[in-house]
Regions:
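Metallo-beta-lactamase
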Residues: 52-105, 186-207
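Structural motif
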Residues: 21, 42, 106-108, 130, ...
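Active-site-proximal loop/helix segments of hydrolase catalytic cores
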Residues: 87-153, 170
Length: 218
């Protein structure tokens, strides 16, 4: 399985047989990053804000999943967990859907714009192999809450997302605060400039590892 980072909260998952899923594609005019133009079998949308649901650069035919669902796309099993975009159960920013995938035997979760440490989500995801985790705060959990959420889930690998870069057109927290939280917890930090994580090649660590991915460019 390969996991490619398209920037902001967008990723492409590719199974060994070539089945593809794109999570949370964004409006590049709103975000400030260049959203790669791509084909895919499935698009998942955690919630309908323009930095998570813009399919302008998705070409060809695909299935769009934006609600509670349990299904499969060829060799990828897909499930959902309903949660909230904020700590007031959606009163501020509405709902959020966590999408989970089983790809080549690897359990992966995209947490969308989760806004608080939700015990229901923690219980459902505990022991997952990989989580894609927002860390920038303002509209999601901040660095400290993200670290608390990750520690409770205890995945093998965390891939940070939804954090400030020099290209962003709106202000959220940067990656550095989350890296500081992760380092304080003794987690391994892998930041080698890669844009793709090959899960079958990931080393088995005694502690959780944080993998920082660069934006993928076709």
């Amino acid at each position: 399985m390969r996991l490619q980072y398209f920037g902001h909260s967008c990723f492409r998952l590719i199974s060994d047989t070539g089945t593809t899923i794109v999570c949370d594609p964004y409006d590049e005019n709103m975000v400030g990053l260049t959203m790669p133009r791509t084909r895919t079998d499935v698009v998942t949308v955690s919630h309908h804000h323009a930095d998570h649901d813009c399919t302008t650069n998705i070409v060809g035919s695909y299935a769009l999943l934006d609600c509670k669902v349990t299904c499969a796309c060829d060799d990828i099993a897909i499930d959902t967990i309903e949660t909230w975009h904020d700590e007031e159960k959606g009163a501020k920013r509405g709902a959020d859907i966590v999408f989970t995938f089983v790809v080549d035997g690897i359990r992966v979760a995209h947490l969308g714009d989760i806004g608080f440490v939700d015990p229901h989500v923690v219980k459902a995801l505990r022991g997952f192999d990989v989580i894609m985790l927002p860390v920038g705060g303002v509209y999601t959990v901040d660095a400290k809450a993200a670290a608390e959420l990750a520690a409770a889930i205890n995945p093998k690998t965390i891939v940070p997302m939804h954090y400030m870069t020099s290209a962003h057109k709106f202000t959220i927290g940067g990656l550095d605060k989350f890296i500081a939280e992760a380092t304080a917890r003794g987690w391994t930090i892998a930041d080698n400039g890669a844009d793709t994580l090959r899960l079958e090649d990931a080393p088995e660590n005694a502690t959780t590892q944080v993998v920082v991915l660069q934006q993928f460019e076709d």
